[in-house]
Amino acid sequence: AGELPVGGEGTFLYAVEYARQHDHGANPRRFALDYWLVEPGVKIGPASLKAGYERLEGNGTVGLLTPLATLHAFNGWADKFLSTPASGLRDFYLDAAYKVPGKGPLSGLTLRAVWHDYGSTTGGIAYGREWNALASYPLGKRFTLTAKLARYEADGFATDTTKLWFQIETTL
């Protein structure tokens, strides 16, 4: 992952990840599953746009296990994919963000929208689509107020879901 300046205020963003997970020892579920992510993007001044393709394989019996992951942050805020389905997870997404620059009353306000299209990695199942929206505003130097909205529209996995969060974060 990294950034490459492309002139002026422009920056090319990139992330590429790969991992392989397989059974161990006398595990009766024999498997070898891949994880990969490709995420190019661009940042111009206070705005950024990224497109990503993430794949957590499944073989129909077991999905890639990520017991220490926070998939809420990566695979949608509606939390439909906190564990990988047995048929895997394919996530194509677009992520746009803008942080208000300057010293005015809206300075530091961050707006973000993310769209996901989910499907399986085996079996050709269209899981659904999800929209996420976020507004985050600093309250002084120690606090941040955040509102998040998630809307999941199911096709072949789970149920339609809408979630709304309000958070106050503090820095110690």
Locate each region found by the language model.
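C-terminal hydrophobic structural anchor segments
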Residues: 89-138
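Structural signature of outer-membrane beta-barrel channels/translocons
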Residues: 1-7, 41-45, 97-101, 136-142, ...
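Surface-exposed extracellular loop regions of Gram-negative outer-membrane beta-barrel proteins
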Residues: 1-33, 145, 165-169
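Repeated loop/turn-to-beta-strand initiation elements of outer-membrane beta-barrel proteins
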Residues: 5-14, 46-50, 102-111, 139-147
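Long, well-ordered mid-to-C-terminal structural blocks that present hydrophobic/aromatic surfaces
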Residues: 29-74
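Outer-membrane beta-barrel "beta-signal"
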Residues: 94-96, 160-172
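Transmembrane beta-strands of outer-membrane beta-barrel pores
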Residues: 18-24, 44-46, 53-59, 100, ...
